[in-house]
Amino acid sequence: MEKMRRPVLIIFCLCLGWANGENQVEHSPHFLGPQQGDVASMSCTYSVSRFNNLQWYRQNTGMGPKHLLSMYSAGYEKQKGRLNATLLKNGSSLYITAVQPEDSATYFCAVD
């Protein structure tokens, strides 16, 4: 008998795509529904007048944001547990390997 895979819900993007003068940050996709064990992938793009760093955050319902990792220069790749992130000149991608039900949350990036 084939084991049924349970869907895992990950809500991505506070949809903050905030803008401040010339600075903009946009997220995609707005919603993910990967299966348990899959790789979830999300990205943010940005257009800023000055870049210092990019941070990825996770926020569970009813809780404050939790910092996941920081990245400082284009071409940078960082791994932390099941999280893997890449930083390009105008964007970043976050990957969660072996997705689990407890990964369900809102994920977003912020640029400083």
Curated annotation (Swiss-Prot):
Compartments in which it is found: Cell membrane
Keyword Cell division listed: no
Signal peptide bounds: 1-21
InterPro entries given in the database record: Ig-like_dom, Ig-like_dom_sf, Ig-like_fold, Ig_V-set, TCR_alpha_variable
Any single GO BP term: response to bacterium
A Pfam family: V-set
Glycosites: 84, 90
Keywords: Adaptive immunity, Cell membrane, Disulfide bond, Glycoprotein, Immunity, Immunoglobulin domain, Membrane, Receptor, Signal, T cell receptor
Cysteine pairings via disulfide bonds: 44-109
CC terms in the record's Gene Ontology section: T cell receptor complex
The keyword Disulfide bond is assigned to this record: yes
Location (main, coarse): membrane
Domain (Ig-like): residue spans on this chain: 22-112
Stated role: V region of the variable domain of T cell receptor (TR) alpha chain that participates in the antigen recognition. Alpha-beta T cell receptors are antigen specific receptors which are essential to the immune response and are present on the cell surface of T lymphocytes. Recognize peptide-major histocompatibility (MH) (pMH) complexes that are displayed by antigen presenting cells (APC), a prerequisite for efficient T cell adaptive immunity against pathogens.
Assembly information from the UniProt record: Alpha-beta TR is a heterodimer composed of an alpha and beta chain; disulfide-linked. The alpha-beta TR is associated with the transmembrane signaling CD3 coreceptor proteins to form the TR-CD3 (TcR or TCR). The assembly of alpha-beta TR heterodimers with CD3 occurs in the endoplasmic reticulum where a single alpha-beta TR heterodimer associates with one CD3D-CD3E heterodimer, one CD3G-CD3E heterodimer and one CD247 homodimer forming a stable octameric structure. CD3D-CD3E and CD3G-CD3E heterodimers preferentially associate with TR alpha and TR beta chains, respectively.
The name this protein goes by in its record: T cell receptor alpha variable 7
Organism per entry: Homo sapiens (Human)
